[in-house]
């Protein structure tokens, strides 16, 4: 019976010890206060914890518990018997060393369009460099297709069409010149071929009006071809 009556009396004693030890815990780290200081509002802190709290909130220095104003001059150090009698606020709390993570170095990959195998080699993913007008993989095929685009453009058809008439005019001039030295029959025969079609292998005489028109049309269609090429690149 004595043991049964003694057991209930031990439980309140242990709980009271926990309550007593909790009174001396830091309100920030919830551990036994080291270099203890008490704020004017009555809350206990470790000076290293409170100093870090104030340093990280320079524009909002309030008590972590009741949000009243607090700073290093508004706390009172607690000196226990047999402990250090120096003011903990004069100590600089140990701070962790700053760790700055350096970004990985970015090396220029060069003009290795085909990956690891070089410009023409394969085996790796294609490298894309954006210049604002599309990728390089799309730019180079269009550059190589430019002569082909000029070939299939109506330029060749228009030049040959107007060139046939120019060749006929040149043949007319040659026929008239030959008629002066020959007889009338030869002149009539040559003059009959004046308006005929120009041969496919002949071209307009340099400096003639037809040659200038051919050059003008060639430049126009060349500009149109360049315009379409840039339109394909940008759009």
UniProtKB/Swiss-Prot annotation:
Q: What keywords is this UniProt entry annotated with?
A: Cell junction, Cell membrane, Membrane, Metal-binding, Transferase, Ubl conjugation pathway, Zinc, Zinc-finger
State what the entry records as the consequence of deleting this gene: RNAi-mediated knockdown leads to disorganized muscle dense bodies and abnormal muscle-muscle cell boundaries. Accumulation of unc-95 in the muscle cell bodies.
Which pathway does the protein contribute to? Protein modification; protein ubiquitination
According to the UniProt entry, which residue ranges have a biased composition of type Basic residues?
188-198
Q: Which domain of life is it from?
A: Eukaryota
Q: Which InterPro entries match?
A: RNF5/RNF185-like (IPR045103), Znf_C3HC4_RING-type (IPR018957), Znf_RING (IPR001841), Znf_RING/FYVE/PHD (IPR013083), Znf_RING_CS (IPR017907)
For the region Disordered, what residue ranges are annotated?
77-115, 173-208
One GO molecular function term of this record is: ubiquitin-like protein conjugating enzyme binding
Q: Which GO BP annotation is one of this protein's? A: striated muscle cell development
Q: Where in the cell is it found?
A: Cell junction; Cell junction, Focal adhesion; Cell membrane
Which segment of the chain is annotated as a signal peptide? none
Q: Which GO terms describe its cellular component?
A: cell junction; endoplasmic reticulum; focal adhesion; nucleus; plasma membrane; striated muscle dense body
Task: Show the catalytic activity.
Answer: S-ubiquitinyl-[E2 ubiquitin-conjugating enzyme]-L-cysteine + [acceptor protein]-L-lysine = [E2 ubiquitin-conjugating enzyme]-L-cysteine + N(6)-ubiquitinyl-[acceptor protein]-L-lysine
Gly residues composition bias: residue spans = 173-182
Enzyme Commission number, as recorded: 2.3.2.27
Let me know which tissues express this protein, per UniProt. Expressed in body wall muscles.
Zinc finger motifs (RING-type), residue ranges = 26-67
Task: State the family it belongs to.
Answer: Belongs to the RNF5 family.
Function of this protein?
E3 ubiquitin ligase that plays a role in the maintenance of muscle cell boundaries and muscle dense bodies, which establish the adhesion sites of the muscle cells to the extracellular matrix. Ubiquitinates the LIM domain protein unc-95, thereby regulating its dislocalization from muscle dense bodies and weakening the link between the muscle cells and the hypodermis. Regulation of unc-95 dissociation from muscle dense bodies by ubiquitination plays an important role in ecdysis during molting. Plays a role in the cessation of distal tip cell migration at the end of larval morphogenesis.
Name of the featured protein: E3 ubiquitin ligase rnf-5
